[in-house]
């Protein structure tokens, strides 16, 4: 009987080994690159001023301090505007990859105007460059949006000053015929939130981005994980089985 159980145990181990899904983190040198024109403070484009100054129209806006930091400057007399900022380099589908491929970045949020400011807004996500759709997590609404005008509310989550949010993209191996689509997932303070989102067929290139209002962020694109590791342990990421 003990010998029989031992054989069953050996078989289970072998099956688990066969089902093992190897995953590689794809390191891409990245930085914040551009503020989308529609979301600039005014026609004078004060958001690119160096050194930082207030908007001549009194509007609030986002300013690219350096490669990783976006500082939101509160308005004086005008409106605090939403700012949309994209990273320079996209997450592109790997070619001839025998493993699952993981792309990932994180941002640390700093509230401007006080922790109780009702104007604070932050979205983190990826823009599908093939079909111009946005897949993102809204920390303000505690909701995940799938790019198809559908959202999924995560009612138990809160949004606090100094929270760290992450967005990941996983591509299957090139020869994985039955797993056609990549998926996207989100994290908060080192833990996955919600389920994954399967993407569309036309999904070869994604660009990291954020929407901000009254909220500054510091990004970690994984440029140097030895000195600045992610809060989320990417080495322990398991291929998701549950999706919206």
Model-derived regions: residue spans:
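PRY/SPRY (B30.2) beta-sandwich protein-interaction domains
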Residues: 1-244
């Amino acid at each position: 009987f003990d010998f029989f159980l031992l054989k069953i145990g050996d078989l289970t181990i072998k099956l688990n080994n066969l089902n093992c899904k190897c995953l590689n983190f794809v390191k891409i040198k990245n930085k914040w690159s551009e503020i989308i024109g529609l979301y600039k403070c005014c026609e004078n484009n004060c958001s690119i001023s160096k050194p930082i100054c207030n908007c001549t129209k009194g509007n609030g806006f986002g300013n690219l301090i350096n490669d990783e930091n976006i500082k939101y400057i509160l308005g004086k007399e005008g409106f605090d505007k939403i700012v949309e900022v994209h990273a320079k380099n996209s997450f592109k589908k790997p070619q001839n990859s025998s493993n699952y491929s993981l792309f990932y970045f994180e941002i640390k949020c700093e509230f401007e105007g006080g922790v109780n400011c009702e104007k604070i807004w932050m979205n983190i996500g990826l823009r599908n460059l093939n079909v111009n759709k946005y897949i993102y997590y809204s920390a303000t609404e505690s909701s995940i949006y799938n790019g198809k005008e559908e959202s999924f509310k995560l009612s138990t989550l809160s949004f606090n000053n100094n929270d760290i949010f992450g967005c990941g993209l996983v591509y299957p191996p090139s020869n994985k015929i039955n797993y056609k689509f990549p998926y996207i997932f989100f994290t908060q303070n080192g833990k996955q939130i919600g389920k994954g989102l399967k993407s569309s067929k036309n999904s070869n290139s994604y660009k990291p981005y954020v929407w901000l209002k009254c909220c500054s962020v510091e990004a970690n694109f994984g440029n140097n994980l030895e000195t600045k590791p992610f809060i989320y342990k990417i080495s322990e990421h398991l291929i998701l089985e549950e999706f919206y």
